């Protein structure tokens, strides 16, 4: 009993000493203080559109061979889409991870002037990827239109409708630019650029 009393007395003295510390001093173990994450006035802060769960919700799309979890905004806009196998289960933590997952880097198109194209010759270097599936920032996949000459992007659940591409790389001794070609797998149809706003054209 005397030992316990002495320990209690020592704890009281320690607590009293702590109370006299300056409020401006931050403990090494104070998890609420992190100078590395302070917002500066001169640095813009990018809002995360997925942080407020009240503005978005999840839905489940089912098909005969696969399922997909779709995150939509309050206005019905599809923000993200993730495919699931039929036997895969989702927890609240999994849904939160999907919502907070940072977006993949969006590749911006760059058009080469026709005069530049005609002055250079490129030769085949290597195959970069076989059977690649290409999606946009909204996780829409490319499918072929009914006429077979154009591609369009849309959300699909049945993966057999997705177009798969072979990506090949080319080089030239006159420039460091290394262009690539997109060809539909198991065909001789190549993706050809058209004017802005026009559908993607396929040519042999």
UniProtKB/Swiss-Prot annotation:
Compositional bias segments (type: Polar residues): 49-64
Proregion residues excised on maturation: 1-110
Membrane-crossing segments per the record: none
Subcellular localization: Cytoplasm; Secreted
Quaternary organization: Monomer. Interacts with TMED10; the interaction mediates the translocation from the cytoplasm into the ERGIC (endoplasmic reticulum-Golgi intermediate compartment) and thereby secretion.
Similarity field: Belongs to the IL-1 family.
Pfam families in alphabetical order: IL1, IL1_propep
Region (Disordered) location: 34-64
Gene Ontology CC, one term: cytosol
GO molecular-function terms, A-Z: copper ion binding; cytokine activity; interleukin-1 receptor binding
Primary localization: cytoplasm
Residues modified as Phosphoserine: 85
Gene Ontology process terms (BP): cellular response to heat; cellular response to lipopolysaccharide; cytokine-mediated signaling pathway; fever generation; immune response; positive regulation of cell division; positive regulation of cytokine production; positive regulation of immature T cell proliferation in thymus
Role, per record: Produced by activated macrophages, IL-1 stimulates thymocyte proliferation by inducing IL-2 release, B-cell maturation and proliferation, and fibroblast growth factor activity. IL-1 proteins are involved in the inflammatory response, being identified as endogenous pyrogens, and are reported to stimulate the release of prostaglandin and collagenase from synovial cells.
Family matches, as Gene3D superfamilies: 2.80.10.50
Keywords: Cytokine, Cytoplasm, Glycoprotein, Inflammatory response, Mitogen, Phosphoprotein, Pyrogen, Secreted
The record's note on its domains: The similarity among the IL-1 precursors suggests that the amino ends of these proteins serve some as yet undefined function.
Listed PANTHER family: INTERLEUKIN-1 ALPHA (PTHR10078:SF33), INTERLEUKIN-1 FAMILY MEMBER (PTHR10078)
Record's protein name: Interleukin-1 alpha
Sugar attachment sites: 57, 87, 100
